[in-house]
Structure formats: C-alpha cells, structure tokens
Amino acid sequence: LYIQIAENIKLAPLVESDAADILKAVNVSRASLGKFLPWVEGVNNIESAKKYILERVNSGLNGSQWFKIYYKDNLSGVFAIKSICPDLNIAELGYWLSCDAQGNGIISQVITKASQLLTSTHVKFIEFRCLEKNAASIKVALKSGALLVDVIPNFLVADNVLQSLNIYRTPVK
C-alpha cells in the first residue's frame, strides 16, 4: 500500500521490518537530526530501531498514523499524524528526513497531500511543534501557511541549548 505524493515521493505504512532502513537513514544524518530530535541518540542498532518504530506505530494515541517516506525509491525519513485531538479537531504532524533527501521540498509536498489522510476525520487544523532553533522545521510550518499560536518556554535542552517549543497551526486545506 503506497500513497503517491509526487513522481519520486511516496508514503507507505511504517512497520517493524523497516528497522534496518530506519537505522541506515538515522546513521547517515545522526549529527543533524540529533540536534533537535532527542530520540536519535537512542536509535543506534537494529533492536533500538525496532523499538523506535513499535513505540510510534503502537502509541495508542488517537488518530495516530506513521509512514516511511520514500524518495527515489529509498527510505528517506518518516512522516506522521502523531495524534488527533478530537475536542479541538487538531492533528499534530511530525516528520524527519535524512540529509541526502533534504532540500527537495519533500515534506512540503507530503503536507500538501496530508489533508487526504484526514478526510475521514473531523480535523480542522494541522499543528506543528518545533524547537525554537529548528529553522528547517519552522520553515516547513510557515510554508504550509501555519502561524505561531503558542510557545512552551524552556521545553528541553537540544544542541546544548535550553529551547522553547514553538507551536504552529494552520487550517486544513
């Protein structure tokens, strides 16, 4: 089961057997991903990559859907509807890309099509949560039309800096 996003971009459900490919993608990009994603440090062998996958696909969070991103037929990252808050009709998105796939507008194209994944829900808003120094993720959120709606100060230390968590939100298109 694939969801075609563009000629060279497709999504498929993230599954435990993706562990080796996930580990490879993380290893290629460990330095850059690790600056903003605390889980990166703990994904360092096949078992921990399986654990990373299973914790996400079995999160039990409402509306959670996790996908691997293929770019030119290589597993190049992960995209998720991390959860849906039914009371507020908000879907939180999450994503990461390996270094070799960055700069191709992949995530922006995936987000443009993400509304198709939400058609059977009552979601009215998409939410992005980005650490304040994560310029690439903030750029993606802003490019989608999202606006800064909240800041959680002193959220966590990343890249040796105590950072706030910025929350961006945009209506589903």
Where are these regions (language model features)?
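Conserved GNAT-fold acetyl-CoA-binding loop/helix
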Residues: 34-54
